[in-house]
């Protein structure tokens, strides 16, 4: 199984036992995937030997930031006014688009939403709506405009790139030295829909060109090209990208000192808000006592919180980060109940209790499951009450169903494992799109947007079902690419890679290539759904949902497992604990 915050590569190879609490002590075997017997129970249980949290409660509560208070706010406001003046005075089309791109990548475009919205609307109708306008543009202007406008919901057809090849189907000679234009073409191609063959071909040509250019370029353009080839911009997590881009942009010749100062100050001020959100979630986590009572499960609260920063780093999503951290932590614990500790009989009972959502039914459960259900029940009811008190509508029916569906999907995978059933790839993916936890997390996100009525919520949920499906599929497949080996070593069910190999006789590299092609195809479907959304509330939700897919790429990147664990810890430190301007 897998879910938000699943880090199988964090499994420790312990040399001595480690017990936290007395209810269900962790018993470590000499091997990572060993079978252990819980002495408090007569059942044979698996152990994943998860390592303790790297960040203690006291450490988290001790964190603080100096980037708060009136002085910071006043300086930020002064800088914002200067940037607004820059936006108003910029008359060159290419430079205007570059400025919008810089503001986005620096992570400060949210401060100028109105100005950027007005700019792009004017640019679209004056320059990109009709072919006779954009036919005269060079490749760079076409590609940058295409990417930004599609990103913001404007329809620009793929035919804008028809003439980048000559009559022999080769790259036009005048483009051979246009590295920036080819880089923007490459990034633009990832906003394509299914069956947009021009963009597919453009991506292939641009990728080949950029790889060949790596030995011929240097400086900031080399950094941008290398970064893009590692992971395309459209698939990157905004907060992670802004941290990287601030450092790159600062070294660029001609970079704006005003933009640099504002980006750094805003990053640190927003980070201070994130610290308070994390401290709030940490207090909730300690109050559940799950870290001491359910010691077979992972204590991944900080990593869970990092996921929520991926959903949205913006200051106005503070309540959302606090709520989704709770959701992610509960998902992680439930995942370990089903994946590692529970017997099949217990899991069937527990799933029934979750489905009934009846506190009286817990008498039939073992003690550890009573603790788990009580914690889930109380936390979900608290979240429901907060929404009722602040927004005036009852979300419990939606939330209960989402959690019940998650547990049912977990049970299906547990039954497959215990009964030795090998599902088809399609059977696996249908269930895995739920068990990956995307639907339950995104159901909570629905109620954290600016929706103002039950009717609006219901419409948004119906309208975005495909979005949830596509995001969850990307989530699942990237998880499989990044963690299948670790989970298989732990004794988990077969994943998409192994199932494709089993069904087709493919080698592992061939299977991985196929899964990557499925991810790319699903992104194209997601792009199409993003483009046809009309309501503002749905668009807000879709932005959050798309960021979940981006976080999956970030968290489950391929590579050595120990290396990835170190990378995640490094990002936790740089994104959450270390101000750009210094402590």
From Swiss-Prot:
Superkingdom classification of source? Eukaryota
GO terms for biological process, alphabetical: diterpenoid biosynthetic process; geranyl diphosphate metabolic process; response to wounding
Q: Which UniProt keywords apply?
A: Chloroplast, Lyase, Magnesium, Metal-binding, Plastid, Potassium, Transit peptide
Taxonomic classification: Eukaryota, Viridiplantae, Streptophyta, Embryophyta, Tracheophyta
- Which region of this protein is its transit peptide? 1-40
- Per the Swiss-Prot or TrEMBL annotation, the motif DDXXD motif is positioned at 335-339
**Identification of the protein by name:** R-linalool synthase QH5, chloroplastic
Q: What is its EC number?
A: 4.2.3.26
Main EC class the enzyme belongs to: lyase
Protein family: Belongs to the terpene synthase family. Tpsb subfamily.
Q: Where in the cell is it found?
A: Plastid, Chloroplast
Catalytic activity, per the record?
Answer: (2E)-geranyl diphosphate + H2O = (R)-linalool + diphosphate
PANTHER family found in the cross-reference section: OS04G0344100 PROTEIN-RELATED (PTHR31225), TERPENE SYNTHASE 10 (PTHR31225:SF9)
Gene Ontology molecular function: any one: terpene synthase activity
**Residue positions binding Mg(2+) 2:** 335, 339
- State what this protein does: Monoterpene synthase that catalyzes the formation of (3R)-linalool from geranyl diphosphate, but not from isopentenyl diphosphate, dimethylallyl diphosphate, chrysanthemyl diphosphate, farnesyl diphosphate, (+)-copalyl diphosphate or geranylgeranyl diphosphate.
Which residues are involved in binding Mg(2+) 1?
335, 339
Residues where K(+) binds: 492
Any one Gene Ontology cellular component term annotated for this protein: chloroplast
What the record says about the induction of its expression is:
By wounding.
């Amino acid at each position: 199984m897998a879910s938000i915050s699943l880090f199988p590569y964090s499994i420790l190879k312990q040399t001595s036992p480690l017990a936290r609490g007395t209810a269900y002590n962790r018993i470590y075997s000499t091997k990572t995937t060993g079978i252990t017997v819980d002495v408090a129970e007569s059942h044979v249980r698996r152990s994943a030997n998860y390592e303790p949290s790297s960040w203690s409660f006291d450490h988290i509560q001790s964190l603080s930031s100096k980037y708060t208070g009136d002085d910071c706010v006043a300086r930020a406001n002064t800088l914002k006014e200067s940037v607004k003046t820059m936006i108003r005075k910029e008359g060159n089309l290419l430079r205007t688009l570059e400025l919008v791109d810089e503001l986005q990548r620096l992570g400060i475009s949210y401060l100028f939403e109105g100005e950027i919205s007005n700019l792009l609307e004017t640019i679209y109708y004056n320059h990109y709506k009709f072919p006779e306008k954009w036919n005269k543009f060079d490749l760079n202007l076409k590609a940058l405009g295409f990417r930004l406008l599609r990103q913001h919901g404007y329809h620009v057809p793929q035919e804008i790139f028809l003439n980048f090849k000559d009559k022999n189907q080769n790259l036009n000679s005048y483009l051979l030295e246009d590295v920036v234009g080819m880089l923007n073409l490459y990034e633009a191609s990832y906003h394509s829909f299914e069956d947009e063959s021009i963009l597919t071909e453009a991506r292939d040509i641009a990728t080949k060109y950029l790889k060949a250019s790596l030995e011929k370029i240097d400086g900031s353009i080399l950094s941008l090209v290398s970064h893009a080839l590692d992971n395309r911009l459209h698939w990157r997590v905004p907060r992670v990208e802004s941290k990287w881009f601030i450092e790159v942009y600062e070294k660029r010749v001609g970079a704006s000192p005003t933009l640099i100062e504002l980006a750094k100050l805003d990053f640190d001020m927003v980070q201070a808000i994130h610290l308070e959100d994390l401290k709030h979630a940490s207090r909730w986590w300690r109050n559940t006592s799950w870290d001491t009572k359910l010691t077979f499960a992972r204590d991944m609260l900080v990593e869970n919180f990092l996921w929520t920063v991926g959903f949205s780093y913006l200051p106005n999503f503070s309540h959302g980060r606090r709520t989704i951290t709770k959701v992610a932590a509960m998902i992680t614990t439930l995942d370990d109940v089903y994946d590692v500790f529970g017997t099949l009989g217990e899991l069937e009972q527990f799933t029934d209790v979750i489905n009934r959502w009846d506190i009286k039914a817990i008498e039939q459960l073992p003690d550890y499951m009573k603790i788990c259900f009580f914690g889930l029940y109380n936390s979900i009811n608290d979240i429901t009450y907060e929404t009722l008190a602040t927004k005036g509508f009852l979300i419990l029916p939606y939330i209960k169903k989402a959690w019940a569906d998650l547990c049912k999907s977990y049970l299906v995978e547990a039954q497959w494992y215990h009964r030795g059933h090998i599902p088809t790839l399609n059977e696996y993916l249908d269930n895995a799109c739920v068990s990956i936890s995307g639907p339950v997390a995104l159901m909570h996100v629905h109620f954290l947007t600016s929706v103002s009525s039950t009717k609006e919520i219901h419409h948004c949920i119906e309208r975005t079902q495909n979005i949830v499906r596509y995001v969850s599929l990307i989530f699942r497949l990237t998880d499989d690419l990044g963690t299948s080996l670790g989970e298989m070593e732990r004794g988990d069910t077969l994943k998409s890679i192994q199932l494709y190999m089993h069904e087709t006789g493919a080698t592992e590299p061939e299977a991985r290539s196929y899964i990557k092609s499925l991810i790319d195809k699903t992104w194209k479907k997601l792009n199409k759904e993003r483009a046809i959304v009309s309501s503002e509330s749905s668009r807000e939700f879709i932005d959050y949902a798309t960021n979940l897919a981006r976080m999956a790429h970030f968290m489950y990147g391929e590579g050595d497992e120990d290396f990835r664990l170190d990378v995640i810890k490094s990002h936790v430190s740089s994104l959450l604990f270390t101000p750009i301007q210094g402590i």
